[in-house]
Every structure is written in structure tokens, then in C-alpha cells.
Amino acid sequence: MTGSTPEGARTEQEAARWVRGMFGRVAHRYDLANHLLSFNIDRYWRARTVRRTEKILERPEARVLDICCGTGDLVLALAKRGHAVLGSDFCHPMLVAAHSKIARRRAPAVLFESDALTLPLRDASLDLITVAFGFRNLANYQSGLVEMRRVLRPGGMAAILEFTQPPNAAFATLYNLYACRILPWIGGLISGSRDAYTYLPESVRKFPAAPELAGMMRGAGFSDVTFEYLTGGIVALHLGRII
């Protein structure tokens, strides 16, 4: 398997089914858990993603899609620039939460239910595709990159914001102590599902390191691939262009 590997999943289909069910169980408390467990720094990470994609967002007719959009936080951040942003996710309860937030804020956004590996979009139809903390959960990372590449126009950009292993060994040890011992306990109390927050650090441990993910993006056809570590390297933001 070349993607997310939840315990007990033997195929990509089983992995996707497990991830969909897990997010469905925590959707009602997902935002609260995220903000508390990240000490609200997740808002900064998304804002940084928007800033790094500004040149695309400044285009008057830019078409923008956030895949694995969850409860819509990055969709809302992107929509603040005035664009009608698309958001997709394959977990229905997460989309229900996103719809509610978008309606309350009257944001220019349209959501649809779809697996990120099989987007119902034409080739070369987008200028920007983003994903925040969802790429790691895909059942096949290479297929996800190829699909992102397929729907981008020449001159378009992909932005992947994802947890990663900190490059500093000492800091990584401290972070892993928090992620493996404290985070599952608190996340379980908040969300009612400890499984989701036990899966999180394990999935980060198995996820390709930032330099490896950059190489995978190049292999999928992206050019000018760069990445930056944020907050001591617990998160990395990857950018890649289509020439």
C-alpha cells in the first residue's frame, strides 16, 4: 500500500473506508479539538498557505479547489480573497459541518462530495488546488498527486499543508511525546473517539518526510517544487507549479 495505512486495513479501499468512518465520528467536535490541540496555531498555518498562494489568488478569474476540505477552514480562508472557492471531501458529516460554517459567514464557496483520487473535474480546469492535513490520509499518495496534476492548468499551483516529522532530533523527541502520549488522551476526551487521535501520530510517523514528498511531487510532474517547515518542523508546506 502506498498511502494511509490504518491498523487492520489490507487494501486501499479498506483504508479509505476506515478514514471516512473515523472522520465521520469526530466531525461534530473536530474544530474544537483541532484548535485546542494545536494551541490555535493551525489558524496561522492556514493563513500562511493563503499568503504563499497569493499570486494565483490575485488572478481575476482564478479557479480554486480545496480537497479533503473537512469542516471548511481553509476554504473560508481562501474565500476571504473574494474568489468563489470549491471545496471537496469524501466524508459527508464533515461536509455538513462545512456547509453550516460557510452559510453562517455567507462565504463565496461551493462544496461537493468526492474522493480526492477521482475528482469529477475536467483536465486542466483549475488554477490552484490546496489540501490541509488531508493528503496524509489518502489511500494512495502517488495517485493523489497525479490527480492534482491532472486538474491543474499550465501556470497553476498545488499547495500541500501537512504534518511531518521535525528535522531536529531533540525537538522531534519532545513533539512525539506530546503527539503519542498526550494528544490521544485529550483528543479522545474532546471528540469522544480516541481512535482518531491515536491514528494521527501514527499516520504522521508513516508519512513521507518533507524532502521525500517534494521528490514525489516532482515525479508526478510538478515543477519549481519547494517546501518550508513551520513551527519547528511539525508541519511542512509544499508548493509545486505546472509549466
Model-assigned labels for residue ranges:
Residues 142-157:
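A short glycine-rich, Lys/Arg-flanked "PGG" loop and its adjoining helix->strand segment in the class I
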Residues 30, 129-130:
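Hydrophobic beta-strand segment of the Class I
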Residues 164-216, 220, 226:
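C-terminal alpha-helical "lid/dimerization" subdomain adjacent to the S-adenosyl-L-methionine
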Residues 223-243:
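Core SAM-dependent methyltransferase catalytic element
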Residues 1-31, 179, 190:
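N-terminal, positively charged/glycine-rich alpha-helical extensions of SAM-dependent methyltransferases
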Residues 29, 39-61:
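Conserved alpha-helix/loop element of class I SAM-dependent methyltransferases that forms part
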Residues 63-118:
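Class I SAM-dependent methyltransferase SAM/SAH-binding core
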Residues 117-128:
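A short acidic, Gly/Pro-enriched loop at the edge of an enzyme's catalytic core
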